[in-house]
């Protein structure tokens, strides 16, 4: 559920008068709404919220009352109870994903790729694809308080993650119009649904507006907020961030399902004729937004959901992997900590790969029908993941629990799920940690982009000069020039580029 805004209001109370006595009635006592809320909170064991009531100013009392009134207490209590109860319960054993559930890079023919590419472009041309961006996070671990999508990883162009992704959408729209149109080329529009959080919403909207939506039409972008939930102690009590406000946190990237439903954007998608939804996380600089090949594969398989996967780099890599839960059970994702050493290292003797090798990289495709089903099913389920974190509280940081759903929590609901292998060096360059960390830094992502684009330019007949070792530099190809290395010959053949630089139109 998406909570309403909780900005302070300083409206004066209006005094009531009677004509018979001309005596002004006293203003309602601040304790009246408080007393009613205390009685409600007692039903859920949360009445301690008001323990410091007498020490609060009138404005603080008003803020606290409205903070509590804005909560769906029955829903939140159900989530807390169900989630705490689920801890420690036995779970079904896991099995490797069957080989025939995965479209591997080596197993695809050129004919497959061509067929899926054209199917995807035709579907995009017909307006049947929508794109959902998960971008509720701030760049805190990158040393920035801005929305993570505003981050510039240091490419020659200086473009942010948001701009790169917007320009990929522009490129796909152009490709669909050029390849599919019979007769005069008509414009193609992919609607972009951008999920923010209460912490990033205003800044994200302003960023897009100030950059003129990076060439997209303003009305083809819809912003919506994911929900928040109170942080709780290990026994389920609300944690107070200040004496007059609850500590809250976003409800995880799996909150996208409820957020789309509560914002009525699933209805909006249906009204636009959208049947398929591409969903991805903001912090992957190599993401192929609205990938026609992935879309065509998804349609060809007739699945309800699909995910791109990459092979684990090594047994101890700290990534979630796809598994089957229970004998012949549904597909789901388990964290690396759930795999013991022997399972993580086990080899499939037939393929020579790790048995549990398919890493989740938050690149998904869904049918709209399935999203509607999941939005209802996950809400009824009410079991959230409990993440133990340091929570800001009125007594300093304290250990507590954040309640989160994950995007992959939907997969057990799917009647069919397809996995689509992609190459890490082509489609997965995460930006999660500050430069100087061991992995997933802006610098490591920048180098992955430059190396990939350098290969594109050389394949298209271009040449490079460089004053530093080539492994530390390269060229950047603007998404407005090429989506995945295509159509570069006219720009690159016979030309020499001095790295680092951006190749643009």
Curated annotation (Swiss-Prot):
Region ranges (Disordered): 1-32
Keyword Transferase in record: yes
Positions contributing to substrate binding: 253, 432
Motif (Substrate binding): 134-137, 335-336
A molecular function (GO) term: UDP-N-acetylgalactosamine diphosphorylase activity
Deletion consequences: No visible phenotype under normal growth conditions, but the double mutants glcnac1put1 and glcnac1put2 are lethal.
Pfam families: UDPGP (PF01704)
Temperature dependence comment: Optimum temperature is 30-37 degrees Celsius.
Basic and acidic residues bias locations: 1-10
Enzyme class: transferase
Cofactor dependency: Mg(2+); Mn(2+)
Transcription regulation as UniProt keyword: no
Keyword terms, alphabetized: Nucleotidyltransferase, Transferase
One cellular component term from this protein's GO annotations in UniProt: plasma membrane
Involved pathway(s): Nucleotide-sugar biosynthesis; UDP-N-acetyl-alpha-D-glucosamine biosynthesis; UDP-N-acetyl-alpha-D-glucosamine from N-acetyl-alpha-D-glucosamine 1-phosphate: step 1/1
Compositionally biased spans, kind Low complexity: 14-24
Any GO BP: embryo development ending in seed dormancy
Catalytic activity annotation: N-acetyl-alpha-D-glucosamine 1-phosphate + UTP + H(+) = UDP-N-acetyl-alpha-D-glucosamine + diphosphate; N-acetyl-alpha-D-galactosamine 1-phosphate + UTP + H(+) = UDP-N-acetyl-alpha-D-galactosamine + diphosphate
Subunit structure as annotated in this protein's UniProt entry: Monomer.
Protein name according to UniProt: UDP-N-acetylglucosamine diphosphorylase 1
Gene (UniProt): GLCNAC1PUT1
């Amino acid at each position: 559920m998406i909570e309403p805004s909780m900005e302070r209001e300083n409206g004066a109370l209006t005094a009531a008068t009677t004509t018979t006595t001309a005596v002004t009635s006293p203003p309602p006592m601040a304790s009246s709404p408080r007393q009613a809320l205390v009685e409600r909170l007692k039903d859920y064991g949360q009445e301690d919220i008001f323990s410091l009531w007498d020490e609060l100013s009138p404005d603080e009392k008003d803020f606290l009352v409205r903070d509590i009134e804005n909560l769906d207490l029955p829903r939140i209590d159900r989530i807390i109870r169900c989630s705490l109860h689920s801890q420690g319960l036995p779970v079904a054993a896991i099995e490797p994903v069957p080989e025939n559930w995965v479209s591997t890079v080596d197993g695809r023919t050129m004919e497959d790729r061509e067929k899926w590419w054209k199917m995807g472009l035709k579907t995009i041309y017909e307006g049947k694809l929508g794109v959902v961006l998960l971008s509720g996070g701030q760049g805190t671990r990158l040393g920035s308080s801005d929305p993570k999508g505003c981050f510039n990883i240091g490419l020659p162009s200086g473009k942010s993650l948001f701009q790169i992704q917007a320009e990929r959408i522009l490129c796909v729209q152009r490709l669909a119009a050029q390849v599919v149109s019979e007769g005069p080329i008509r414009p193609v529009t992919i609607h972009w649904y951008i999920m923010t959080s209460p912490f990033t919403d205003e800044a994200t909207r302003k960023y897009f507006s100030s950059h003129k939506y990076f060439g997209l039409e303003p009305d083809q972008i819809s912003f919506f907020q994911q929900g928040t939930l109170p942080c709780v102690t290990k026994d389920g009590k609300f944690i107070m961030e200040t004496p007059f406000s609850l500590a809250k946190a976003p409800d995880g990237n799996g909150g996208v399902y409820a957020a789309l439903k509560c914002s009525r954007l699933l209805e909006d998608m249906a009204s636009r004729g959208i049947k398929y939804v591409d969903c991805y996380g903001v912090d992957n600089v190599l993401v192929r937004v609205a990938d026609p090949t992935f879309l065509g594969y998804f349609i060809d398989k007739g699945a309800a959901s699909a995910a791109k996967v990459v092979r684990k780099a090594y047994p101890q890599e700290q990534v979630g992997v796809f598994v089957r839960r229970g004998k012949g059970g549904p597909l789901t994702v388990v964290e690396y900590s759930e795999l013991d050493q022997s399972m993580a290292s086990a080899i499939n003797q037939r393929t020579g790969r790790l048995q549990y090798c398919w890493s989740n990289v938050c690149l998904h495709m869904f049918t709209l029908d399935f999203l509607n089903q999941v939005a209802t099913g996950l809400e009824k389920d009410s079991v959230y993941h409990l993440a133990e974190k340091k929570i800001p509280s009125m007594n300093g940081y304290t250990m507590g629990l954040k309640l989160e759903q994950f995007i992959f929590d939907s997969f057990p609901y799917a009647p069919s799920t397809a996995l689509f292998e992609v190459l890490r060096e082509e489609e997965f360059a995460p930006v999660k940690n500050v430069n100087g960390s061991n992995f997933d830094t802006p610098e490591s992502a920048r180098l992955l982009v430059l190396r990939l684009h350098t290969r594109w330019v050389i394949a298209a007949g271009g040449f490079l000069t460089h004053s530093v070792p080539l492994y530390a530099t390269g060229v950047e190809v603007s998404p407005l020039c090429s989506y995945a290395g295509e159509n570069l010959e006219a720009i690159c053949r016979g030309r020499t580029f001095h790295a680092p630089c951006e190749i643009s139109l």
